Swiss-Prot record:
It is found in: Secreted; Nematocyst. It comes from Actinia equina (Beadlet anemone). Belongs to the sea anemone sodium channel inhibitory toxin family. Type I subfamily. One of its GO terms (cellular component) is extracellular region. Pfam families: Toxin_4. This is Delta-actitoxin-Aeq2b 3.
Length: 82
């Protein structure tokens, strides 16, 4: 059972690592709250996308063409907007 869990975990990590940048991440990403979304009385729109910090991206964790839009930086991820 432990070997199966390790194999599945490794497959997920490899799939994430080999994800193509050209894929439209806005359709498959996790939404997050940008500063520009602001507090609204009827709820907030989540216009940002959560990006995992990896070595290939800049210091802010966002890929090319995206900018950091969150209130504070996360330890493993940042909220980015196109």
């Amino acid at each position: 059972m432990n070997r199966l869990m390790i194999l599945v975990f490794a497959a997920v990590i490899l799939a994430l690592a080999s994800a193509d940048e050209d894929v439209d991440i806005t359709k498959r990403g996790v939404p997050c709250l940008c500063v520009s979304d602001g507090p609204r009385p009827r709820g907030n729109n989540l216009s940002g996308i959560m990006w995992m910090k990896t070595g290939g991206y800049g210091g802010n964790g966002c890929p090319k063409g995206w900018h950091f839009c969150g209130k504070s930086r996360g330890f493993f991820s940042d909220c980015c907007k196109r």
